[in-house]
Amino acid sequence: MFTDQQKIGAMLSAMGLFFGFLGVLLFLDRNLLALGNLLLVSGIVLILGLQKTTKFFAQKKKIKGTILFFFGIVVLLVTRWTFVGMVIEIFGFVNLFGDAFPIVISILRKLPIIGNILNHPLVNRLLQKADSGNELPF
């Protein structure tokens, strides 16, 4: 079903998210955030392949998110402004992968523990407001 390259890419992406989360928990540790970014991007390349990854990041409607995501990585690596780099990078990440959030939420709702939390009336109402797209969730 999945090739070995895609399995390695999924693991690298998961490790990238883990190291990024750990970098945020450790008060924006620059080295862990940089390692997380490197692993996440290389994992995406291995999952999709180089040609599809280039095609994904170069889409006309996603070019703003691509520029912000990679500019945030550059700010994080080159300067000492880790917080600014993370904010820029997260904004770019949301612009790039925001279309997939409803799919991820519907998958998470089917999981045993997380599904119960997401189906709670307060959380469910918040997610429905965020999904409508025309109003803020708060």
Swiss-Prot record:
Q: Tell me, which GO biological process terms does this entry list?
A: endoplasmic reticulum to Golgi vesicle-mediated transport; protein transport; retrograde transport, endosome to Golgi
Recorded topology in the membrane: Multi-pass membrane protein
Can you name a GO cellular component term?
A: membrane
Q: What is this protein called?
A: Protein transport protein got1 homolog
- Tell me the function of this protein: May be involved in fusion of ER-derived transport vesicles with the Golgi complex.
Spell out where the chain crosses the membrane.
8-28, 31-51, 63-82, 88-108
Q: Which Pfam families match?
A: Got1 (PF04178)
Which InterPro entries does its entry note?
A: Got1 (IPR045176), Vesicle_transpt_Got1/SFT2 (IPR007305)
- In which domain of life is the source organism classified? Eukaryota
Question: Where is the protein situated, by its record's location annotation?
Answer: Golgi apparatus membrane
PANTHER family named in the record: CGI-141-RELATED/LIPASE CONTAINING PROTEIN (PTHR21493), GOLGI TRANSPORT PROTEIN 1-RELATED (PTHR21493:SF9)
Q: Which gene encodes it?
A: golt1
Q: Which parts of the chain does the record assign to the membrane side Cytoplasmic?
A: 1-7, 52-62, 109-138
What family does the entry list? Belongs to the GOT1 family.
Q: Which UniProt keywords apply?
A: Golgi apparatus, Membrane, Protein transport, Transmembrane, Transmembrane helix, Transport
Q: Which residues lie on this side of the membrane: Lumenal?
A: 29-30, 83-87
Q: Is Acetylation one of the keywords?
A: no
